Amino acid sequence: MLEGRILADFRQTDASLHQGRPQSSSNSSVPGAPNRVSFAKLREPLEVPGLLDVQTDSFEWLIGSQRWRESAAQRGDATPVGGLEEVLYELSPIEDFSGSMSLSFSDPRFDEVKAPVDECKDKDMTYAAPLFVTAEFINNNTGEIKSQTVFMGDFPMMTEKGTFIINGTERVVVSQLVRSPGVYFDETIDKSTDKLLHSVKVIPSRGAWLEFDVDKRDTVGVRIDRKRRQPVTVLLKALGWSNEQIHERFGFSEIMMGTLEKDNTAGTDEALLDIYRKLRPGEPPTKESAQTLLENLFFKEKRYDLARVGRYKVNKKLGLNAGQPITSSTLTEEDVVATIEYLVRLHEGQTAMTAPGGVEVPVETDDIDHFGNRRLRTVGELIQNQIRVGMSRMERVVRERMTTQDVEAITPQTLINIRPVVAAIKEFFGTSQLSQFMDQNNPLSGLTHKRRLSALGPGGLSRERAGLEVRDVHPSHYGRMCPIETPEGPNIGLIGSLSVYARVNPFGFIETPYRKVVDGVVSDEIHYLTADEEDRHVVAQANSPIDAQGRFVEPRVLVRRKAGEVEYVPSSEVDYMDVSPRQMVSVATAMIPFLEHDDANRALMGANMQRQAVPLVRSEAPLVGTGMELRAAIDAGDVVVADKAGVIEEVSADYITVMADDGTRHTYRMRKFARSNHGTCANQSPIVDAGERVEAGQVIADGPCTQNGEMALGKNLLVAIMPWEGHNYEDAIILSNRLVEEDVLTSIHIEEHEIDARDTKLGAEEITRDIPNVSDEVLADLDERGIVRIGAEVRDGDILVGKVTPKGETELTPEERLLRAIFGEKAREVRDTSLKVPHGESGKVIGIRVFSREDDDELPAGVNELVRVYVAQKRKISDGDKLAGRHGNKGVIGKILPAEDMPFLPDGTPVDIILNTHGVPRRMNIGQILETHLGWVAKSGWNIDVANGVPEWAGKLPENLLSAQPDSIVSTPVFDGAQEAELQGLLSATLPNRDGEVLVDGDGKAKLFDGRSGEPFPYPVTVGYMYIMKLHHLVDDKIHARSTGPYSMITQQPLGGKAQFGGQRFGEMECWAMQAYGAAYTLQELLTIKSDDTVGRVKVYEAIVKGENIPEPGIPESFKVLLKELQSLCLNVEVLSSDGAAIELREGEDEDLERAAANLGINLSRNESASVEDLA
């Protein structure tokens, strides 16, 4: 039952997301894109890859989709194995304890999803598909095989936008940055002897750690599974090595020979027993149990797993099995021996080692923060690990059932219990730190959330333990993780964002693309390199000048070597070149124009604050962009993109119908005024007309925060940078009233209110218009069912849904029994539990959803009916709201002036916003000034005089930039945008207005006049257009006042905080202020009757009602609590009056209180409540 469409269909195919990719900064490769004039000088040989690929590719690997198999085949992987298949292969076969029966699984496959995305959101369902596997039971005694297709539960599926819908809410699984399994060599200095000590850890994906070290006495030791240290030769002997073999392999090393001499164990048996005693102290050791223990610890796949990536890292570091495919994922004897040899050579200062296969490997320590040693666990792997946990729990159940059930009657279905698997998946999506409520403030915040990299979470770091090193920017982050975008608080450096061009390889390492350079010639051949591969090469930056043939213009080129060293080298030595100047930054950072002129701290704030911008009623793309706006908007998935080329057949506010060239008809439905996760308004509107031709990949409808398919987070406002009467001191902002009147910065916010009718012990609750003791005026907007009508204006306290709950009934009097007999159930006692608009909220009802058990809707147990009401609120900009630019320049509105009082230009145009000059120099975000200048140039248009040839400053500009019309939109890509000289020249070449005046001089300043007096200001002022965003920190959400409200149960003091409708805390320092002024009575009142003197509160109310004098305050409740606490410590505390008589804290006060309260009609049984509705 849908009344007022809330959530419209939103369908978009995968192809539409990945077709038509724009070039670096012009939007030419996306059909129908707005023509943004670009100041870019460099050609980018590679288009920006799909920005959601990190999510979608990983999930496709997990489910083993056809598209993933095709791309794996292209990479040369002959037998690709999906994530689910991998888990089933690991698990199979499950054998019983005697080995006579086995159960194996294969061929995971999915049915159709149960309901489309919009229905799942609407009905609080999970967007999931049923998973089936083939289970095969083999009786080894008889050779009998039973095969069945088994249902393994509903598996949450990823939407085309890279999200999951769990119980109706959209969630994102964040990729996790973890230390890769492998061998890590470390170097420390001993505090007492200043000697260099070396150690190595063999870290598996799953299993016991193995650690070797050389101590200050020059002995080589080993720790198995974090237990006590032993000589390393004990482990070698336990592995079956004789003294002669150790001599033969390690004869070159004095420290190994010294360790062998100190080792007292005679042979393999004794060494095994010695290890067993250390690992299992207190248990009687036997040779067999010791042998089994060691084998299980490191050499059995069930207990120890290096994972493919760990095997790859170990082989690479130690030079083992070079060029051979990865097969085993356990440790081998050779791994252990090669690790010890590497450690010994490292300690002895050698720089290279020849591995057993003849491969020479460098001997060096490892940097744990290097991106060659940190990898990403993407969505697919995180879910796979959770399924593995569920499957191993199921394995135990299967084993037990094999032994208890009758062999003849056993089928795969009777053995399998899918509950542990389903529970494990549910637990991950519902409660994991990495499964997060999607940030839907605007399209950019959603896109950034999907590209987020987190070092926190299970198996990762914790905020408390993470030091500075792991948080810091590392040279290996270049092109992989953005050095700018990270949170400002305790998570700084632990949460990052994937760089624009980065991708994740099958091992989970982040790769970034480079152009191959051959003999000093830069080719368009693209190679993706991981961080440790990049270390072996010399890389030039993207803006190194090259000629038309791709040769470096200068003989010596600035390059980057290992560990971030920068130097000039001959061009013949260069191996690779960056593909783009914006390669190192993330999407949000790449949307900051003139980023190269901003301090990194402010750029960080700018990138983060773009994600907090609220969608405005009318979106406006920036005059000064970076060329990233279009791709970001398309890949965020909030715009509607045409799947196929064709002609628009029909357009309305709700849908667009396209007749494709192949004769098929496709209808795209618009989302109309839907509520996002963050209460902002997600609305789509068509930007095409009937009869218009569209191409595949063209944007046909705008979403929130987009204009013509480009990201549009704010507004272009005319800004003057000057102090004004001190009203814009300390980042305060002065606004023109025009922005309020014309709804320039107005946003729509939608709140969802929900109520359900349940079965209670006293009877069923009822949603009804028949509410006791409520006037007809209050019920005026309710329909006959008791639900508010769509379009009704509501404010706090208004009833949205009428509901009554049965009261506990007492013994009926004869009169009541008579009434009950005449009127039936109508007269029974009910109380009003209606859904009311919370305190401080108001708006217009825009939609209602009713779910009822009678209509066969799925509802939780005990719930008969559920009603949701959506209330939209139009919020104009007001004092106290927070505004920000894209350069970390943020401020709170301090004053809104009438337009006629604002400073104005010589032609009478008043400015929209005044920012203080002090906000620029010490913050070093000069980008905002350059943006202001270029904004003015773009708004005015320009024409460069080329009568005497192109001026020197315009020499690098493309021909189409020599002139532009007013209101042109421009892009200045990061690190490749407009230069300072070009800006100065363009300011001098701006077109005059209709009166023939050029209002802003070549220095970017204008003569401004005071709007109040008409007098000119004594100095010229910087004036231009800046892109300003309205952030989610709105004063309406923060302002709060309390009259009467809830009290804490124990202390009887008012609760705190807006959510609890709490009071303002009058703290210790405020009390001092009162004391300083001698305001004794005011202070006494604050500490007693206004706080927790329960008797006094009621008596004061009584006195006010009766017009009497306010009585003396009583004893605060918290004082009584203090006495009780002291008495609980066995301290007998008495309260004495000034004359030494004991004061009796009477319990009878409560009775007086109840009596007075009853006379006044006050309900004192109110307890601590989380919701304001319960206060009435």
From Swiss-Prot:
Q: Which UniProt keywords apply?
A: DNA-directed RNA polymerase, Nucleotidyltransferase, Transcription, Transferase
Question: EC no.?
Answer: 2.7.7.6
Q: Which domain of life is it from?
A: Bacteria
User: Would I find RNA-binding among this entry's keywords?
Assistant: no
Under catalytic activity, the entry for this protein gives: RNA(n) + a ribonucleoside 5'-triphosphate = RNA(n+1) + diphosphate
User: Family assignment?
Assistant: Belongs to the RNA polymerase beta chain family.
- Its recorded name reads DNA-directed RNA polymerase subunit beta
Name the species this protein comes from: Mycobacterium marinum (strain ATCC BAA-535 / M)
Q: What is the lineage of its organism?
A: Bacteria, Bacillati, Actinomycetota, Actinomycetes, Mycobacteriales
